[in-house]
């Protein structure tokens, strides 16, 4: 992603917008599916996200491709969270940082042995709220404090939800035969 392409988007160049869309739709779709499993909902969220990206890009200071990609991912995550809040299905739960060890209790080494694909599959079986918090913690790297702020909950609430989420994930592990 070049600064020149971003400048063209700032100047409302439709071809540049299409190029950005084509380059990042795969990544942003997979991020969105972590939070919302329904294809139609994902399409709506991505449409809103790209509108926000294209309208906000003029105020963005370009700091390299990685920073730009991370900014777009944050836009999609925020739009997905807003969608879930508006549906009033959030039941907030599991929280952590970015490794399997961080969501596993000492007595749950089976979580640490899962591949990333297996973990994604298991987390996708969690209810919306649980899935949202697990994704924020494990895959997006948010801290308890950041999740609490994002979801408008106290840190203590987020911590207790983490424990319940771990139990729910362990139940799924047992059901799927991992334990």
Where are these regions (language model features)?
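N-terminal module of bacterial RNA polymerase sigma factors
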Residues: 1-27, 124, 145, 171, ...
